[in-house]
Every structure is written in C-alpha cells, then in structure tokens.
Amino acid sequence: VTAAENNAQSANFDWLVDDFVHRVHGATHALILSADGLPLAASSSVTSDESEQLAAISSGMLSLAHHGSSLFDKGECEQIILRLRHGYFLFMGIGSGAGLAVLTSAEAQMRVVAYEMTQFVENTGHALTPEVRADLRRVVTARRPRD
C-alpha cells in the first residue's frame, strides 16, 4: 500500500466520521480510536490535539468500564454514556480493535444518537481490519508535528 493510498483511506474514514457529525442532530464531535487509545479518524470539529486527548480519555474510560464489568461478572462493556452539564459523551466499540467516541450537545436525543452510532459501527466495522487500522495509525503519526 502506497502513502497516497494510505492518505486516501484515511480521508475516507475522516469523511465518514465528519458526515456522521453533520447528519446526526446534536452530534458535535466524533472520533474513531484504536483499542490502545490512538486516534484513527476524526470529524473536522476535532483538532489534532483534541483527537489525541479524546482518544486517551475514551480508552481510559473503556478500561475502567471493562474492569468494573469484569469485577461484577457483567460481561463486556458494549457502550459508555456520560451525561455532562452541556451535552453527552458516548462510546461504542467497533469490534475488538477500535471504537467510536461521540460528543453531543445537551439537546441531542440519545436514542437517535445511539441508533446512528450502531448503524455506523455495523456499516464500517468490517472495513476496520487490523491492516487498515495500522495504515490509519501510520497516517495519523505522519501528520503529527515534530518537535
């Protein structure tokens, strides 16, 4: 796979996430992240710095949820929903290697957002193979400013 193909693939996932934010009423930010907490694709409303922080926060919350569900033998964590003063944070796994994090406004209808996230995961999950995730990771790493 060439660098140009990697960039095109990354742009496709960025477009899909951006489209999600524009299509789903109340969604303000969205991010696909790897299981190890690295951003893979983000909506245009998420800056590069924010994408890294949101990915790390999401990964940390998922880890806490997994440990809590394991401790009480409740099975795998399927989604996380946090109600914030000015909106919501939602996380849903995309297979075992990635996840979708979404921030919304306070006016967002959670039922609609959760449904749209489920549709997004079902429609894109098959495309996020380990190879594609590795390619996206390389593209994101190459985009980072060097100190």
Q: Where are these predicted regions, by residue range?
A:
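Acidic, low-complexity cytosolic segments
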Residues: 2-27, 36-147
